[in-house]
């Protein structure tokens, strides 16, 4: 792994961008917990912000945490992933989780074709990424 010099003068290993993406998604999920808390404690305030489905806020919050953590783990457990795995995994993890936010604001959006197409594309991306991760790990096993 490449080394970078940090401000203190020590050398530290460069962090894989996929790991950074996963950790950022995980942190975003942690922060969305505040919004979910608002949904649970002050429904009127949440509604005034445009939230129509608290259940979808919960799904958004949990998916960001789960997929962010799994993405960070993936980039750590199997370093130097090929681009055909790295990009679909990183993009799919974000788009899968983020697809719940529009549903929180407009539950009927799931009936619209553009939304459905986007969700299918996201599932394809995530499926390619996680399957590619498993295949890459199996090939490197030994």
Where are these regions (language model features)?
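Helix-coil boundary and interhelical linker segments in multi-pass alpha-helical membrane proteins
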Residues: 4-20, 74-87, 133-142
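N-terminal signal-anchor transmembrane alpha helix
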Residues: 14-40
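Hydrophobic alpha-helical transmembrane segments of polytopic
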Residues: 22-26, 85-96, 122-125
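Core segments of alpha-helical transmembrane spans in multipass integral membrane proteins
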Residues: 27-28, 32, 54-77, 91-98
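Interfacial loop at the N-terminal end of multi-pass membrane proteins
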Residues: 34-60
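Hydrophobic cores of alpha-helical transmembrane segments in multi-pass inner/ER membrane proteins
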Residues: 66-73, 125-133
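Non-cytosolic membrane-interface motifs at loop->transmembrane helix junctions
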Residues: 88, 111-121
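Transmembrane alpha-helical segments of integral membrane proteins
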Residues: 96-110
